[in-house]
A protein has these predicted regions:
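Amphipathic, well-ordered alpha-helical segments in soluble domains
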Residues: 43, 47, 69, 144, ...
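Basic helix-turn-helix/winged-helix DNA-binding cores
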Residues: 3-114
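Acidic interhelical loop/turn segments
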Residues: 153-171
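Residue-level recognition of alpha-helical structural elements
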Residues: 62, 112, 134, 163-167
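Amphipathic alpha-helical coiled-coil segments
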Residues: 178-192
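Hydrophobic alpha-helical segments that form the core
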Residues: 169-181
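Amphipathic alpha-helical dimerization/coiled-coil segments
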Residues: 103-150
Length: 192
């Protein structure tokens, strides 16, 4: 499948079909939910917790995104609703059509990374900050990335222990990201 995937990405790029909504008809958030539902039926809250546990180090999702996507996936027949549980919580299960759609999504070109770093954006306008603002910004970012790095290192270690090489690899991306951010912060100017 690997060679076929690369060929399909190249063909899609050459034809100009890689933009906006994927050919599978699902966006990355919907695809992430379908992927998580391969683990078994889950309520919206359980999906949010699973996304936080498994994906948050490298892919963010908000509660509103999760709850907005679930009815859309149900309307498309990609998930089915289970019986309501306590406090009207409703489990969702992936359907055969959902599994096929997810497989198509996996084979598509993932597109380009979207880089949106709020610290880099503020540093870009560093000449408009006071020196104390820049130092405070850098200190807060250092603290965040140091704590996040420790967390994702532990998650990657646990994934390797459990034999989940794919999850461990994705978590290593987050480890590398936080290391790079900390390295960059050391060289970022802190006075205007």
């Amino acid at each position: 499948m690997g060679g076929e995937t690369v060929k399909s990405w190249t063909a899609a790029r050459q034809s100009g079909s890689v933009r906006g909504m994927a050919e599978s008809g699902v966006n990355p958030t919907a695809a992430a939910l379908l992927g998580l539902l391969h683990e078994g039926p889950m309520t919206g809250g359980q999906l949010m917790a699973a996304a936080e546990r498994r994906l948050a180090p490298y892919w963010s999702m908000t509660r509103s995104q999760v709850y907005r996507e679930l009815p859309v996936l149900a309307d498309k027949g990609l998930v089915r609703l289970g019986k309501p549980g306590p406090r009207m919580s409703q489990p969702y299960a992936i359907t055969a059509a959902g599994k096929r759609t997810f497989s198509r999504w996996l084979a598509e070109d993932p597109g380009r990374d979207t880089i949106r770093n709020p610290i880099a954006l503020r540093i870009a306008f560093g000449q408009l900050h006071s020196a104390s603002q820049l130092k405070s910004l850098q200190a807060a970012a250092n603290e965040y990335h140091t704590e996040a790095l420790a967390r994702v290192r532990e998650q990657a270690k646990n994934a390797r222990k459990e034999g989940d090489t794919y999850d461990a690899s994705a978590l290593e991306f987050a480890v590398a990201y936080h290391k790079a951010a900390l390295s960059w912060l050391k060289s970022a100017p802190v006075s205007s």
